[in-house]
Amino acid sequence: MKEPVDCRLSTPAGFSGTVPPPGRTKAARPGTIPVRRSRGSASALPGKIYGWSRRQRDRFAMLLSSFDAALAAYSGVVVSRGTRSLPPSLRLFRAMTRKWLSVTARGNGVEFAIASAKEFSAACRAGWISGTVPDHFFMKWLPEPVRRKSGLWAQLSFIGRSLPEGGDRHEIEALANHKAALSSSFEVPADVLTSLRNYSEDWARRHLAADPDPSLLCEPCTGNSATFERTRREGGFAQSITDLVSSSPTDNLPPLESMPFGPTQGQALPVHVLEVSLSRYHNGSDPKGRVSVVRERGHKVRVVSAMETHELVLGHAARRRLFKGLRRERRLRDTLKGDFEATTKAFVGCAGTVISSDMKSASDLIPLSVASAIVDGLEASGRLLPVEIAGLRACTGPQHLVYPDGSEITTRRGILMGLPTTWAILNLMHLWCWDSADRQYRLEGHPFRATVRSDCRVCGDDLIGVGPDSLLRSYDRNLGLVGMILSPGKHFRSNRRGVFLERLLEFQTRKTVYEHAVIYRKVGHRRVPVDRSHIPVVTRVTVLNTIPLKGLVRASVLGRDDPPVWWAAAVAESSLLSDYPRKKIFAAARTLRPGLSRQFRRLGIPPFLPRELGGAGLVGPSDRVDAPAFHRKAISSLVWGSDATAAYSFIRMWQGFEGHPWKTAASQETDTWFADYKVTRPGKMYPDRYGFLDGESLRTKSTMLNSAVYETFLGPDPDATHYPSLRIVASRLAKVRKDLVNRWPSVKPVGKDLGTILEAFEESKLCTLWVTPYDASGYFDDSLLLMDESVYQRRFRQLVIAGLMREGRMGDLLFPNWLPPSTVVSGFP
């Protein structure tokens, strides 16, 4: 029998706050909830009556919202204020947990209550993995039949990620642990370093091109993340690039051996930026960085570093090369594409135990010797250019860090979070741990042992795999050899369940008998085989439809101010619709924001239509088109109208509100580029032009590229972080809707269901963009480089390099088969 847990004395894991003495605590004893109706009831949200600040009230409200969203998603009904909509089996659970959290927050503090909820969520995740009822006293408030439902455990386990950000105590502890980890040393055996070096060399030879294309260096560096020189508020990386260009000479530069071409003449971006960064790296000391803490949802924090600009530029060059290989790696390919179904199908036929792996502070604990061995192997392969190897050396060597308290250290361990190459190096190290264990498993044991298929999928420090127990033990041992520590509560082994990228997977298996070379033992007068092994083989993998709650409870958008609720809610809900049931999303979203749909409807925006059809983007209860007749007429003109470009009317309207820097100027330049292009429905041909089926993608990429160039020359755009008001959006939408109806005045309102309309809409978007290979002046059209897998992409980049090089070096780089027909290199502008 388990010992009772005294909630007055126990401290939840991850608690951020001060624990009051036992005599002063107001937490309940096990089995009792001494709550006064006037102060701590579930119907009254603790707030001003407890003397809390606005921040404390907001964090506690988010805590309660996470529980309500989880219950709504599980039951599929909207949880109203009176809880009468919930099934009776869940009403008591909701009321009692809210009361317990209220009393605990009043007596022990809001941070203690949040930490308690996170501990409960972790217990639900562990219970779901093991298939046993979670070991937490919250479960006693559920009826026995409901308490044993694994689907409920799975949904409640997502509460932890949706909790508020970490607190002050998390920040202090994280900085101390970060400094201790990066100041420590870890000895790696020499044979392990040799194996890592050989593995990375072999990996590069298999996944990277034998002749590295130097034109990859022509892609611009973009972003607004903080650097050592400038904070994000001061413009970040974009402003630092501007400063770097303006403060550097542009003519008569000395040649650099690491560059495959050069030197450049004039302010030729981005090659000139790369050239200047390489000079600063060779002339400087250890790269410098400023350490800061980013508070993340899930009651935790992350320590990041803002590094020097030239190190980031070199790192981005190396990252682009490594990502070309990672996209070809079968263990990452489907994940990077976002094809989770293909990721799960890969395990069908694998035999053994399911392992879900997650490492603790993985990037901080990688020894520098391990990172250096991986870079040595990549360099030995000859698949990377010298400037890219220089970027890897800069990002994996010692770093001089300055902490918020003014202290400084030079790292002896760790590849920093915030450097471009960190994620790629982490993947290579993780792949070595699995492949080395797999190779060792196949070499050991009986030489006639039957082959057992094993496999894994990797994404940074996350891994899910299926394999025999001996292979998994070798994998864990390899992680220890390279200094990794498994994350407690996130590293699981199970016969039929796993977690990968916060998606819950169930593996259906069948027992299979593998017979080796037969060895018998005598039992009486019989001979009995003794070398048979029974091992489960995966026959099917199912992804649970339990929805993640983090984005629904409160969403954010990278690179911009905190978005208004009406913007973030639509983005979060629509992103879940393709993978999760509509009923669950609607129930959770309307529980959190019951009046948002009415707010849209008052301004004439249909709330439950996708944005590409002129709606707000919220997920509705059904696929019925809930819109007035005038809007349904606009949809008919949008989908079935004769104008080939009309299908993108609403899409372009919403894109106009996205936070790209210098959006107006970039869009105007794109319109100028595309003025001579022709857009038609599939079927019509233009013999003197080249057709691209996804022409709108070309336009979007063109605008984003122009935005990046403007940001590099002009610095960050202060208006790119702001959002329009909802009334401005409604006014713009009304104008687009009116223009669509005027295109086809006699059109009838659409009467089909939403699924049929979206299917027809996808067909109407299939327009061919016909472009000319040369502009009016006879020069090669640079818009062609924007299309993925375009035959002209490589050739155009070679022309860019030719335009940056001195005349005498052009012939050494360019070959006739690289250039479009009748192209004269000397005529390139």
UniProtKB/Swiss-Prot annotation:
Catalytic activity reported: RNA(n) + a ribonucleoside 5'-triphosphate = RNA(n+1) + diphosphate
Keyword ATP-binding: no
Keywords: Host cytoplasm, Nucleotidyltransferase, Ribonucleoprotein, RNA-binding, RNA-directed RNA polymerase, Transferase, Viral RNA replication
Record's subcellular location: Host cytoplasm
EC id: 2.7.7.48
GO MF annotation terms: RNA binding; RNA-directed RNA polymerase activity
Gene Ontology, cellular component aspect: host cell cytoplasm; ribonucleoprotein complex
InterPro entries named among the record's database cross-references: DNA/RNA_pol_sf
Region ranges (Disordered): 1-39
Subunit and interaction comment: Forms a ribonucleoprotein complex with the 20S RNA, where a single polymerase molecule binds to a single viral RNA genome. Since the viral RNA is not encapsidated, ribonucleoprotein complex formation appears to be the strategy to survive in the host as persistent virus.
Note: Yeast strains also contain a double-stranded RNA (dsRNA) called W. The (+)-strand of W is identical to the single-stranded 20S RNA. The W dsRNA seems to be a by-product of the viral RNA replication cycle.
Task of the protein: RNA-directed RNA polymerase that replicates the viral (+) and (-) genome.
Protein name as annotated: RNA-directed RNA polymerase
